[in-house]
Amino acid sequence: MSTTFLSVMAGLSGIVVFGALISVFHIYTDINSFVDEAHRELGAFRGVANDAWNSMVNHDDSARVARSVFVRRQKKQSQCNCGPQASNCPAGPPGPPGASGDRGLDGQPGPAGKPGQPGVAGPAHHQQQECIKCPQGAPGPAGAPGNPGPQGPNGNPGAPAHGGGQGPPGPPGPAGDAGSPGQAGAPGNPGRPGQSGQRSRGLPGPSGRPGPQGPPGAPGQPGSGSTPGPAGPPGPPGPNGQPGHPGQDGQPGAPGNDGAPGSDAAYCPCPARSAAVFRHRNVAVNRHRAVAKKRVVAKKRVVARKRVVAARRHVQA
């Protein structure tokens, strides 16, 4: 069961992973297509923007001419012929420079130039001039220490020593390596015969450990008929048994006798009692007895249940 469950879960996991890979591939393809489309739209937008700019620049001169004509006409129409106008007035000071215009487009490339004439070797002019002698400058800072030079040659041998004498013996050297084993020696002469031995008898040793238990023996023969043995002593009392089921309710008791009539009141005589009064009294007494009996039965049931629960706990313990 566990192997089948694991196989099913492994198959479902593989399907989910395969679906995730396919989704990633689709998302990657969609992103690439979106990027390509965005680049194409940007290129088209740049082309439209360049065309619009070129058309605006080409029509700039005509727009300026039309604008100047319109402004002059507007100025002429805005003149007022209210009085004589001044004439031959001196020119006013030049106005402030206007705002710089937009940068114009690059011009068309000019035609290729004509090839130049071939070069001619000219005469060489050599003028010998003396070197300019400058005064000596201040000494520069000390340089870094140089690399060590090569080792010098060996010196001449010294003069021989005189009167040294032989020195004390040196300490013992380390032990040498073990030598190879020597050849076997010649066999020796036979030894003398030994003395005669004495026979002795030792004491018995201690007893050994008991051996393992042997196999069970064969069943014995049936015994001869004999009288039963005497009765053993009585055993200890056993535990209390479980409480029995509650018994059935008993039969309702017989109705009681009628009570004696009460004494009359002191202030007025009571009328004689009728049979309806006695019947009502009997019904009330019977009801009271039934209610009391039900209460007793309910108490007995509660006590019996408690005993059953206590017995179960005792058995479990």
UniProtKB/Swiss-Prot annotation:
Chain intervals with Low complexity compositional bias: 108-124, 135-145, 175-206, 242-262
Sequence segments annotated as region (Disordered): 80-262
Family matches, as InterPro entries: Col_cuticle_N, Collagen
Triple-helical region, as annotated region: 92-124, 137-199, 202-264
Keyword Disulfide bond found: yes
The keyword Disulfide bond appears for this protein: yes
GO molecular function: structural constituent of cuticle
Role this protein plays: Nematode cuticles are composed largely of collagen-like proteins. The cuticle functions both as an exoskeleton and as a barrier to protect the worm from its environment.
Protein name (record): Putative cuticle collagen 80
Species per Swiss-Prot/TrEMBL record: Caenorhabditis elegans
Lineage: Eukaryota, Metazoa, Ecdysozoa, Nematoda, Chromadorea
Gene expressing this chain: col-80
